[in-house]
Amino acid sequence: MTADRPVTLAAIAGAHGVRGEVRLKLFGEGAETLRAFSVFDAGDRKLTLKSVRPANQGAVAAFVEIADRSAAEALRGTLLTVPRSALPPLGPGEYYHHDLIGLPCVSTEGAPVGHVAAVDNFGAGDILEIEKPDGKRFMVPMTVTAVPTWDAETVTVNAAFIE
C-alpha cells in the first residue's frame, strides 16, 4: 500500500438547494468522518470543506469553491478523495477496506487462492469477496477463524472456508 494512493471517501450525487450545497454518497463511516479533512481532491481540482451534515442516505456538504446550484450540479459524479497518508493510523488488528482490496490470497496450506475483489459489510461484520483465477467468487467472513492473518502483502484464508 502506498501512502500517496488516493482513497475515495465520497461522491457528489447532485445539488442540494440553491446555495451550492451538494448531496454526497458516502463510502466511509458517516458524515462526521469527513470533518477530519479540510481539503479533498476532486478530479483535477481541490475542494475546501465548509460544512457537512448527515442527510438521508448520505450527507449534505458545502465547499468554499462551490457558490451556486449550477456549480454544484456540474460536479455530479465527482469523487472526493484524500491521500492514504492523510487517514488516521490504525491500531493492532485494524484495517482499511481499501488496503485489502487487490491483495493476493493464499490458503493456510500455502496454495494460491486468488485476490480480494471487494470488502462488504451487511451489518454482521466485514466479509471478503475473493475472486479465484477462473473468475468465480466466494465470500469469507473477516474473522480470526476464517482469515487467521493478513498484512500489506497477502491475506491468508483458512482452507476450510475456500469454495
Curated annotation (Swiss-Prot):
Coiled coil: none annotated. It is found in: Cytoplasm. This is Ribosome maturation factor RimM. The keyword Cytoplasm applies. NCBIfam families: 16S_RimM. The PRC barrel domain binds ribosomal protein uS19. The keyword Chaperone applies. Binds ribosomal protein uS19. The gene is rimM. PANTHER family: RIBOSOME MATURATION FACTOR RIMM (PTHR33692:SF1). It comes from the Bacteria. It comes from Sphingopyxis alaskensis (strain DSM 13593 / LMG 18877 / RB2256) (Sphingomonas alaskensis). Keywords: Chaperone, Cytoplasm, Ribosome biogenesis, rRNA processing. InterPro entries: PRC_barrel-like_sf (IPR011033), PRC_RimM (IPR056792), RimM (IPR011961), RimM_N (IPR002676), RimM_N_sf (IPR036976), Transl_B-barrel_sf (IPR009000).
